[in-house]
């Protein structure tokens, strides 16, 4: 999300045919199954010496075309005059993003955080491919190992879901408050 928002903002500000072509390529990449990128990611992590590390798995999730496309589409709904007025007031594009764009796209960012966290939390193939040490692998793989024993599968699955449920409740409440705040402000 941290890399996707500035990228989407750049695409929003530079509105030409090349930008539209790049957004279309992002749409096409979103249509590909994520397993296609396993081998290039494996080769990259191997060359950097980051196999069998948790940082290597996190590194493969740092950029998402889903975030870029969704934030770009959300930004298209913002009136450009707000951004242009903010750019006239300050020379820093970071301040424009932080003080003008981020409060406006807060509901979208929160929803994307929820989707990205759930996707990362339920990740199966990447930890299996990139991490061989069982102690470093995530809970999904642990539960699949516990499923072999049978008795502990359902309690482990319930415990596994607790962080997702808590984050879901917090994020949904924040999204509702953001949307209600926007409605009251108008």
Regions found by a protein language model. Give the residues of each.
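A structural signal for multi-pass alpha-helical bundles of membrane permease subunits
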Residues: 1-186
């Amino acid at each position: 999300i941290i890399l996707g928002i500035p990228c989407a903002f750049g695409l929003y500000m530079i509105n030409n045919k090349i930008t539209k072509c790049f957004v279309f390529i992002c749409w096409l990449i979103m249509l590909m199954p994520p397993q296609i990128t396993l081998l290039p990611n494996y080769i990259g992590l191997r060359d950097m010496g980051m196999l069998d590390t948790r940082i290597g798995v996190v590194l493969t999730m740092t950029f998402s075309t889903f975030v870029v496309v969704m934030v770009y589409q959300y930004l298209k709904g913002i009136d450009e005059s707000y951004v242009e007025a903010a750019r006239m007031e300050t020379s820093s594009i970071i301040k424009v993003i932080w003080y003008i764009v981020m409060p406006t796209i807060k509901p979208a960012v929160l929803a994307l955080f929820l989707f990205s966290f759930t996707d990362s939390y339920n990740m199966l193939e990447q930890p299996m491919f990139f991490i061989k040490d069982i102690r470093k692998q995530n809970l999904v793989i642990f539960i699949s190992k516990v499923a072999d024993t049978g008795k502990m599968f359902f309690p482990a699955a319930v415990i596994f879901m607790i962080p997702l449920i808590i984050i879901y409740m917090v994020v949904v409440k924040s999204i509702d408050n953001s949307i209600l705040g926007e409605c009251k402000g108008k």
